[in-house]
């Protein structure tokens, strides 16, 4: 397709060895692919670049999704880029649909995204199924079509956010600049795999606790940017009370797993309220 010369695909990986080969294999060979590899897997880099000539892998310290995407965008030389998570089902014929609407909108947009299938309504807001295309507050960060110039104009993703709410913050800032997000219902995707695979049970639990910590940290951080500190404190007060109640409950019932989970949640929220960085990393969590 003629569109392939004007787009790059950016994939961010972290301990994604088991799925990345299968995912990259399905990408048309004429599309440039940039892989930002955050677990510094040199073997993965060598094998991917040897097997797929359209792929370039960059090894980095894990500084989070935002920092990684910003880095990947800097490495692109095309007008547009598609940020994809390797756990998704993607039909690359849909690229022509993205280009059609990008042209129709005269590139005056923040991001374009697909309709996600088999998702929970509460956790993933989407436009009405009957619509062809419509504005939406935020496009899911795992599948975003963007214009590089507009991405840079908006200021990229906030590198202070390690994980979660990166796209929400980005789309919020874009909206204030009258650059809107659009969901295209003709383009569909769904999650078919797991991005991070950790076999060790204890390490897997540590990973889940890390996600809990960063989710609440980022949630308050974004709320503070949007609503201000005092209003955010009021909004989060019921959450703080629920967390403290759960900690007391699981201490009484001696449920160590759930107790640890809510301690991580409380700690993440505490550090975000204090204005501390999203510092927690997997290797810092001890069993």
Locate the predicted segments by residue.
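Acidic donor-binding segment of Leloir-type glycosyltransferases
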Residues: 24-58
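Short aromatic/hydrophobic "clamp" motif used to bind/position activated sugar donors
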Residues: 81
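Short, well-formed alpha-helical segments that are part of the catalytic scaffolds
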Residues: 11-29
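Non-catalytic, C-terminal membrane-associated alpha-helical segments of glycosyltransferases
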Residues: 210-218, 229-287
């Amino acid at each position: 397709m003629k569109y392939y010369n004007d787009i790059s695909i950016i994939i961010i990986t972290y301990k994604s060895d088991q799925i990345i080969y299968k995912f990259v294999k399905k990408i048309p060979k004429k599309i440039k692919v940039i892989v930002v590899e955050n677990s510094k897997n040199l073997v993965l880099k060598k094998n991917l670049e040897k097997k797929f000539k359209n792929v370039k892998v960059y090894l980095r310290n894990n500084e989070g999704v935002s920092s990684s995407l910003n880095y990947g965008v800097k490495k692109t030389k095309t007008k547009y880029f598609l940020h994809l998570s390797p756990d998704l089902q993607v039909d690359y014929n849909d690229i022509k649909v993205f280009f059609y609407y990008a042209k129709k909108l005269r590139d005056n947009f923040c991001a374009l995204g697909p309709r996600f299938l088999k998702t929970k309504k509460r956790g993933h807001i989407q436009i009405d199924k009957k619509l062809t295309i419509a504005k939406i507050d935020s496009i899911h960060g795992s599948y975003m079509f963007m214009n590089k110039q507009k991405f840079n104009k908006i200021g990229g993703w906030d590198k202070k956010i390690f994980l979660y709410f990166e796209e929400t913050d980005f789309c919020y800032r874009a909206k204030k600049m009258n650059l809107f997000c659009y969901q295209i219902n003709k383009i569909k995707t769904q999650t078919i795999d797991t991005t991070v695979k950790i076999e060790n049970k204890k390490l897997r639990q540590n990973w889940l606790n890390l996600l809990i910590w960063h989710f609440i940290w980022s949630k308050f951080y974004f709320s503070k940017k949007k609503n201000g500190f005092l209003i955010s404190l009021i909004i989060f007060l019921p959450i703080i009370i629920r967390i403290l109640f759960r900690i007391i409950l699981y201490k009484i019932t001696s449920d160590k797993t759930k107790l640890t989970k809510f301690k991580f949640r409380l700690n993440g929220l505490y550090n975000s309220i204090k204005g501390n960085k999203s510092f927690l990393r997997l290797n810092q969590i001890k069993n």
